[in-house]
Amino acid sequence: MEPQPATLWRSEADSRIERLRKGDLVVEVRGHDGALVKDARVQYRLKRHEFLFGTAIAYSPFADTGEDGRNYRQFILDHFNALVCENEMKWYATEVEGEGVDYAPADALLAFAQENGMAMRGHCLFWDKLQFVQPWLAALGRSELRAAIERRLTDIVTRYAGRLISWDVNNEILDGGFYGQRMGPDGTAWMFREAARLDPKTPLFVNEYAIFGESEKTERYLDLIRDLRARGAQVGGIGVQLHDSDRLVVDGKMTLAPAGRPEWMVSTPITAESFIATLDRLHGETGLPIQLTEISAMLPDATRRGDILEMIFRLGFSHEAVHAILLWGFGEKTHFLGPDAALVNANGALNAAGIRISHLLREEWTTRGDGMTGTDGRLAFRGFYGKYEVVVRAPGCEAVRELRLTKSAPSAALDLPE
């Protein structure tokens, strides 16, 4: 199938965004006596999207007390409403030697998220690849390993219960196998069941890479979810990574990174149509919400990098089953794929890719405006779903309020003080 022209896939995505991510809100202004107030000036601006746009955050650059640290934190505050710890909640980070657990870095990052009204994903309870399993853990026998897993689950799940929007339970199972080989075919399902018992309210996710453009692996992913559910696992969502996004066909061509491309990256082209078709299939056959959990684009040309990231964001934001899109880092000095994956240069300035994403999040996909109430005391506007700051000015008084625009709340009353 030939890829769609950019103007076509983009216009179709934008139409879906307009339909799925925006709504009409009627603000009704009343005086302290309950009377409707006409000719009141109402200013409104979106403070926080309902949809989650986020990034992985790492403790070392976050805690930097110099200019680099300030730039790192400010870019996050300026652009995102969701975070995920890049490594700090992983078992190999919290319990390096099997003697004592350190949650201080993860606690600090979660506190930062909560202080700034950001959601936090939990990543990850376990990682199924042997190279990411601590030597002391890999050396345990089966019964000892099970006991260690139980202790890990009880410790970290209860510690963060009610404070996370999701947990990745066993990361990258399809290309892993450590826990499956050691614990048997029910091992991962047991992890899900135990995590759900310890924290019934936090959705539990699977999380895999190389799904887009790979029909065979998509089928394996669906088989995994079916098997987990058949074993009583409460799978609450599907995580989809995309680090090898240089495979995306943009403007009719694919531009693979010329050098330094990790061997685990695949090279099958991804068109806009196949991207949407994969999301359709994952959601259609499971009914589960989807989060684009780890997004990167590694190319030396920052403009082309921006083209690819914009395509991912626009397509993901336009799909009804996708609830979140998270970059896996952004800084030239800190990105795990190196400078060719950065949005922010070493001096803190946005490069062409960063400018593109910043424009989407702070200009194109935001809502701000003002107007006057009519004789019925009402002002109507259309905007993105989320939290708004509304300022109302009428003769002799001014009020600042927070309102939420949701599909279930198309109107809001605002009472002025005496």
Role assignments for model-derived ranges:
Residues 26, 48-107, 112, 118-119, ...:
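N-terminal substrate-binding region of glycoside hydrolase catalytic domains
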Residues 27, 83, 113, 156, ...:
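Conserved, mostly hydrophobic/aromatic
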Residues 52-54, 82-84, 117-121, 164-168, ...:
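Structural preference for beta-strand elements that scaffold enzyme active sites
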Residues 294, 300-301, 305-340:
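Substrate-binding cleft of secreted/luminal carbohydrate-active enzymes
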Residues 364-376:
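Short, acidic Ser/Thr/Gly-rich low-complexity loop/linker segments typical of extracellular
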